[in-house]
């Protein structure tokens, strides 16, 4: 039988190994050095292994006691692995997330709740959903965050960390976890700084236009980039656009309230340039997708969140320009040319407290904004070197 001294002296080797205690119980020592108590047993003629607990969280005596209980269950036909799985289903990250989500979605808009559920279903639950929440370690959660960062989705990485943290806090207050690893990951993240999006000064816009004219990649991504510049929309708002949101007759794009940062409808007047671009695109994506900017591989989804950044990168402006930079340039130049500040703010869908700039009446300043957005599109087109 094992002694505490033998257990403490056990060091990781090039290959995993076991230290036998007796009656099927042993200490498993993997290459990582994280020791685990396991019990080998037979039931219904099949050999199985039960993970009893982690050392040193579970002492030698506690492991023996738990193994004894498991063997007692086996003697009356109860499979401890199946019993543990049934018990842990309610303590898995996925199960607790669903409880938390059902509780929180009551105060969210339908659009936001749908967006968040998609983020968890696509990128988080497939990795850690099946794990018991109390067993999830910081490195496992960091793996989730790294997947967002690796594709350049820094804002979404930060959102994923925060929302996972809320799930862990919910587990803690409901007695199913003792530790929230999410806050500790902040220093390990590449970071998302909202105020540091690159943008171009006005005198560099002609050179950018010339570079953009050389782009030979996806026509959908190219038109998305141009429309983003002409409209000063947020990338998220642009990607959400469906053909039902585009009214060619009245020359407006309507962005659903569920997508907007302020959760209120946003109406965007279309310049001649935008109408021409979307008319061209309608023959490409409208027959196959409800999305204006349909994804390349999955027409049921919009283009990826980094599509515009990839265009910018391909024409040599990585780190110098960005989708958010287009909005900054629009705001700066329109203010310099003394267009009405409130019309500019409404076009940008900026909410500033209780002031007039925070009022999202979809008809507000529409006539003035029609004139303003046509001027802006013409100004951009004239800047050719």
UniProtKB/Swiss-Prot annotation:
Keyword list, A-Z: DNA integration, DNA recombination, DNA-binding, Hydrolase, Transferase, Viral genome integration, Virus entry into host cell
SUPFAM superfamilies the UniProt entry points to: DNA breaking-rejoining enzymes
UniProt GO molecular function: DNA binding; hydrolase activity; transferase activity
Ranges for domain Core-binding (CB): 91-172
Gene Ontology biological-process annotations: DNA integration; DNA recombination; establishment of integrated proviral latency; symbiont entry into host cell; viral genome integration into host DNA
Entry EC no(s): 2.7.7.-, 3.1.-.-
Active site annotation, chain numbering: 234, 261, 324, 327, 350, 360
Positions of the Tyr recombinase domain: 195-373
PROSITE patterns with a match to the protein in the record: CB, TYR_RECOMBINASE
Pfam families for the chain: Arm-DNA-bind_3 (PF13356), Phage_int_M (PF22022), Phage_integrase (PF00589)
Family label: Belongs to the 'phage' integrase family.
Function field: Integrase is necessary for integration of the phage into the host genome by site-specific recombination. In conjunction with excisionase, integrase is also necessary for excision of the prophage from the host genome.
Name of the protein this chain belongs to: Integrase
Organism: Shigella phage Sf6 (Shigella flexneri bacteriophage VI)
